[in-house]
Amino acid sequence: GLGDVYKRQAKLYLTYQDRFPTSDLASQTVDQIGRVTPPDNGYRARAYNHTVRADAEGYAYASLLNEELQLGATVKFRADTLDKFNLWKCLRKRDYVIGLEPCNCRTWGRDKAREHGDLVMLEPMESKDFYLELQVHDGAEELRVAAARYDGCL
């Protein structure tokens, strides 16, 4: 089922411009970011922040695709309002999780975001609309079409 899509050597994809590992461990393992491996008791959680790259229609994408199971999922979102993406991985037994998080801020906290001019604030009575779409892929052809929008696996 779809709950197993992340198992058995699934791959992660993202339309992005820049990557910012959030720790020394994340920096040291950046070459492994796109691979999803079986549970490992020694695995330590790591996170990567990204600035996304929009397509011609203004959308960015992140996918988790598993060719072996011929299943996958893609999150599609507007890059003008959700211009960043956080990827969090913990592939440890009992804590086996991947977070695919379109967002408008990095995970470094409000103070650092304010310091870098990245803190998004709404004015009183202001509202903002966000667009997010979840796509489920079933079968080899749907996976091929989903993977074609990327330059390659993370």
Question: Model-predicted segments: where are they?
Answer:
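Active-site/ligand-binding surface loops and adjacent short beta/alpha elements
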Residues: 7-79
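Active-site pocket scaffolds in enzymes
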Residues: 68-154
